[in-house]
Amino acid sequence: MSAPGQPPDPLTGHGSDVLAFDIGGANLKAADERGRVWAEGFELWRRADELGPRLAALAAGRPRRIVATMTGEIADCYPDRAAGVAGIVTALLHAARSIDAELGIYRLDGRIVSAEEALSAPLSVAASNWHALARLAAARADSDRALLVDVGSTTTDIVLLDRRGPRSLATDDAGRMASGELVYTGIERTPVAAIVRSLPLAGRRRAVAAETFARSQDAWLLLGGLPEDPASHDTADGGPATRDAARTRLARMTLLEPAEVGQDDAVAAAVHVADRQARLVAAAIRRVLASHGIQPDRVVLSGHGGALASMALARAGLDLPRLRLEEAIGPAAARAAPAVALALVATGGIP
């Protein structure tokens, strides 16, 4: 994977038969059937008009077929999900027509359908990437009682699996959030104020501001759950993704000056944030398993939030064999796992 603007894009070379896109609200991911992947930040709510041209650029290698899954339809640049699906499908049609490729959209029932069919039933293709990912996880787990825990930048998916795929309690976002299968917390983008009401800083417990001065990313940077990346400015304040900058952002959450908060203080605050987040995910895990009445025999970990997933599993009391998807398919592919899964589905690589 490369950062946007660093040519050549790895997918623009000729030779791909299928190019799969996973279009989120904050990230754009792609994979082809040869295992090449691409992931970049793409703030859809700010750049919806740029989506079609960007997809066309990534498809410049002229694959015969483009397939797509999405979660970006919920972005608040769209009045509702149906409009979001229409906007994303229109952008995909722009890309497909620019290279005379077929276009297929992934449905929540596991089928890949035409753009016309997707537009006629937009909610059947909304928020569908988790389903494709669960099929890949099920194929790798080879168990009738596996549990998928996928922690991404924004959300966490908790899905019971059998050998055929997901055994979900619900399929749409609202139903999945009500069942506990979708937890709107992630390792990077969740505002600290949405996780805790106070932080232990500078010798006392302090209330936090109801502002997005810091995100979960800052806690996990300080704890080593995310690597430092001084070149990345995809942070709450646009500063670098470093531990020292994370310390400053956490200090700001309690309206303290950065000089008043040492590194040890900041780490203690980060532990509190991480623990609260892990408790939230652990409660959802217990709820999903209780609803199914089944105890899993193994766990599949997906996404780049493995540190949060591991802490949550410990909180939930699940000491089980674990399959890390990044070890099974490689770290780059794991970061774009729904797109990788969809490319495999489209070519018959997984059932």
Feature roles, as predicted:
Residues 26, 154:
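Conserved Rossmann-like nucleotide-cofactor binding loop
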Residues 151:
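Active-site activation/catalytic loop segments of kinase-like enzymes and analogous catalytic loops
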Residues 1-25, 31, 35-148, 159-351:
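Nucleotide/phosphate-binding catalytic cleft detector across ATP-hydrolyzing
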